Each structure stands twice: as structure tokens, then as C-alpha cells.
């Protein structure tokens, strides 16, 4: 935990408070926290330590006994929260467990997870694999995935959590004893493995089956309503009227949809402005306050500035 919190400090903007970092790590459900996480490349730490209490966080953050080598082990993902990483891996676990058991004609097993969205994803892909007789293709992709993880991370640990026919998974405590690593350090290394895994399976060409198991971060309930409204063709004013909220609330919902990957069509919201100059400026001056960007680029609204920042940090908007 010391190392994760220290890593968050190294990535955060100077003007951000300790409370802002605490909100990201514990997963505060606010649009400001979503934007803070995305704009500082800390999205994969969002909700990674939901049970952490503020006094303990302060104690960790003031600790200076940090090993630089340990910090180098920590990486972040710009497009997925910790829950998204974990749910996606749970889907891989469940599909592996299901295929392993059904190939041995065992249909009476306790699923690794009861998560509804995970089950939906796995059910869809399991049917596709079964109907197309793609079991060998799945095994080949899974093998390639873990070979790639090993090549990139040298030692990997999440393979201990795979479960199959008459093969139970290990607990973190057991892995800690086997590998002679503290459970805190193991948590950090597992997070590194999960992030590397997500970078890998985002490549649909390389992983045409496993790519289907990516689970996006969960939306807030009101943002979900906005998303359905957008899919039904409603505009800003109609969306605001539908939920009886101010237009800037809908702005926040739309930003959340971009931050969490539900919408990627930036031009639909930026087609009326020339935003490349701001992108160039932002990339060279990433740590400024929003009002400074607004003062320099007064023709842009705060929503547009935030949206461009989200696009840049997610790697979806480029100057060239």
C-alpha cells in the first residue's frame, strides 16, 4: 500500500490535495474524482483500496521508507478502473473454469464468481466457442496471453488464480507463502499483472476471443440513464429535461461515458471547434489548473477542455 500511494503522489498534479488522491484510491463516486483519476493517469487505481481509512492513508502517505525499485514495479492503465481490471480477469477465470469442466462432462461446479455482468460476458463467449468448436483457439489465446505476460513482467502471479476441472485456485495467503512475498507486495504485483493483461487483450487482432471478455467500468445510475437517452437520439436539452437536471450535469454524465469507454466519438462533441492548438498546449503543460487553460483558450468551454484532456489521457486523441 505504501508503494501504491507513493506512486499516486508521483503521478498527481502539484495542486491536488491528499483528499483527492484518497478519493481515487477508495473509489468515491463523484464526477470530479473520475476526472481526477483519468487526467492524472490514475484510473486503474480507482477503487483499488475501498476499505482504506483516512488516518491510515495519512500514515502511509507520510512514510518515506519507499524503495524506488518497488515503485518501478507499479504501472497504470489509462482506460480502465481497478474493478474493470478485476472483473475482466474474473471473466477469464470463469470461462477457463467452465470450458475445463464441461470438456470433462462436469456441469455441476460452483462458479468462481456470481457477478452478473461477468456471467453475461462468459455466457455469450462460451456459446460462440461451443457453436464454432473454438476450444483449441481459446486455449491457444490463453497460452499466448500468459506467455506474453511472462515475457513482459518476468515473474507473474495471477496464473495461480485460474481454476479448472479438479483444480482449485490458490489463495493470496498461499501464494504469499509459495513465492515468499508479503501479501501487500503480492497485491501490487497482481495489479501490475492485471494491467499488463488488459493492455494485451485490448488488441482484438491478437486476441479475437479474449477481447470479448473486457468489462468496462460500471456507470453511475443517472449516467446510465443519459447513456440510454443518447442511444435513443436525445440531445443535451432533451437529456436534461428528461432527468430534470441542469445541462452541466449532463456534461458530467457525458464526460463519465468517455472516461469509462462507453463513448469514443469525440468529433460528435468537438466538430464545431478547432481543438488541436489546445491539445498541443496541454501536452506541454499537463499540470495546470483548468481555469488557466480556460484563460488561455477562452473560446473553449470547460466541458470541451475536459473532454479533450480525457481524450488525450486515454490515448484516443492525438495531435497528428
Question: Which residues does each predicted region cover?
Answer:
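Long, charge-rich, low-complexity intrinsically disordered regions
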Residues: 1-320
